[in-house]
Regions:
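Alpha-helix boundary/capping detector
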Residues: 37-41, 80-81
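Generic structural signal for hydrophobic core residues of well-folded globular domains
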Residues: 15-18, 54, 83-86
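Short amphipathic alpha-helical interface segments
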Residues: 2-37
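A short, conserved structural fragment
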Residues: 55-65
Length: 91
């Protein structure tokens, strides 16, 4: 699968908007039941692949959760810096 920088950006923006202290995003391991807003723009497999890359890059913190789900806990400092750099480039 190819790297899609737009997908990474959209995931990070979604995480920033939808997480908080003790407020996680459940992500089902069964991609066919994936109802995240991003699914309107990306295929479920592409979203999960890029969530994995976001974790690998150190942009997000996740928790393994259960057999059915894992959880996106929050953005990391690097994730916040990445979004801030994008916002500065767009101004």
């Amino acid at each position: 699968m190819r790297l899609n920088p737009d997908c990474i950006r959209d995931i990070l923006l979604y995480v920033e908007e939808n997480t908080g202290y003790m407020s996680y995003i459940p992500v089902p391991r069964n991609v066919h039941n994936f109802d995240i807003v991003l699914q309107n723009n990306y295929e479920p497999d592409e979203i999960l692949y890029h969530i994995d890359l976001c974790e690998e890059y150190g942009y997000i913190h996740t928790d393994s959760g259960t057999i059915a789900n894992f959880y996106i806990k929050r953005l990391s400092v690097l994730g916040h810096e990445f979004l801030e750099n994008i916002r500065q480039e767009n101004n």
